[in-house]
């Protein structure tokens, strides 16, 4: 039997079981747990390679073969870190297994035929497209920035750069919901809209859900009173949609105890649960320990660095329409920015108490940095806290699974869309991101949307090959014309579907129906289920979880940073 060195094999077909891969310039390493391919029967495309007629490519009709195969991919997802071929059919993940020609090769369950396209994923990492669940729809160009960072789904609200949208993630009322759904129909990204949840009577909330809102957002700038919270959650329970909340920083209508009492045992998604982005000062972070609270962070506080506090004060004044010449506005801003709770947030993420990360796009958050900042936190926490059991000093598989779940499967489950997106699993939309390991979490090599390339780095268009400088991200055919409608999804609630809303608005995209929002609890947050008793000292702002003081020094240097953005 012929033999090949492990290094030569990895160079040719990518890493296999037992091989370790470093994630960009972080301190994080993953180890391949399983290889679905068969040694000696691997498929690869190119001159003199395997995927040729009668060899790795069979004679079957298109109905019996894949539309697209990603060969020899290293999949990193919440369920595992594995080597496999990925078969895509009709824009969805059809098979994760062994590609080739079943007429001449054993163990093939990803058939390659004359109607099959190939993407060479040898030496590449494949992850699910990110789900950003805190979007202010301030400008449509956010979509390009997000796609270029590896995010393929938006949940949020807004109507453009209106004063209300600059501060709150709400698309208020049926008219604006209709217009934004029509606008979203042309954007090459999955979208679900949040309506305004601040009302003390239910009819206006039911009206918005019937008009297409997949969730409701309670925001202190509209008045997050106990009455509004109770009313909003009552409607959510009735109509199976999610509620997101930005609580009362000033504690005017009640403190955190009053908010938790108004919520009761009903499921709710708490935005920027640390508090710098808004919420009961100084102790909204306590909510992360509740079984019915699904806590997320927005990315400006991630990770805690020597510049975090200074940057936040200026951001806050702009986003919430505050006046630096008014003492009360300055006091409001300063009450929200606390070093101690920001530092504790990173640790609570590492412990699995905070379940999600998101952006807060252009409203105290950066839409293109959800993925990047999530992994910066993971890196910092490995340096500060060492390996997470059962990891070793040489492999960080569990930590990697915990952190990737924060911006993929967990926000998808939270908002009732986990059956369509959020992971690399059979049956889901083929929203996939390819990364070279050296550029992981920073600059994708390709982004697939519904099985079609939607954006990619591309060189000189007049070049004789695709790679000459200048290379920068450009929209691809998946983002153009009617192809967008076949590869993107608009999410709607069942109430809107029952009214025939998609037909009434002439929406041409795929439609996904949110469901199961009210059943999701903290134990359902993949790899992020911890429910510690969190305490905050009202004078010093020190944070304890189950009695342990949570402190860490701010970072002065980070990976995934300047060395990647010189050009």
UniProtKB/Swiss-Prot annotation:
UniProt catalytic activity: urea + 2 H2O + H(+) = hydrogencarbonate + 2 NH4(+)
GO BP annotations listed: urea catabolic process
Protein name: Urease subunit alpha
Extent of the signal sequence: none
HAMAP family, per database record: Urease_alpha
Pathway as given in its UniProt record: Nitrogen metabolism; urea degradation; CO(2) and NH(3) from urea (urease route): step 1/1
Cofactor binding note from Swiss-Prot or TrEMBL: Binds 2 nickel ions per subunit.
Domain named Urease: residues: 129-567
Residue numbers carrying N6-carboxylysine: 217
Post-translational modification: Carboxylation allows a single lysine to coordinate two nickel ions.
Catalytic residues identified in the record: 320 (proton donor)
Binding site for substrate: 219
Native source species: Pseudomonas putida (strain ATCC 700007 / DSM 6899 / JCM 31910 / BCRC 17059 / LMG 24140 / F1)
Binding positions for Ni(2+) 1 per the UniProt entry: 134, 136, 217, 360
Keyword terms of this UniProt record: Cytoplasm, Hydrolase, Metal-binding, Nickel
Keyword Nucleotidyltransferase in record: no
Protein location: Cytoplasm
Classification via NCBIfam families: PRK13206.1, PRK13207.1, urease_alph
Enzyme Commission number(s) of this protein: 3.5.1.5
CDD domains: Urease_alpha
GO cellular component, one term: cytoplasm
Pfam family, one: Urease_alpha
An example Gene Ontology molecular-function term: urease activity
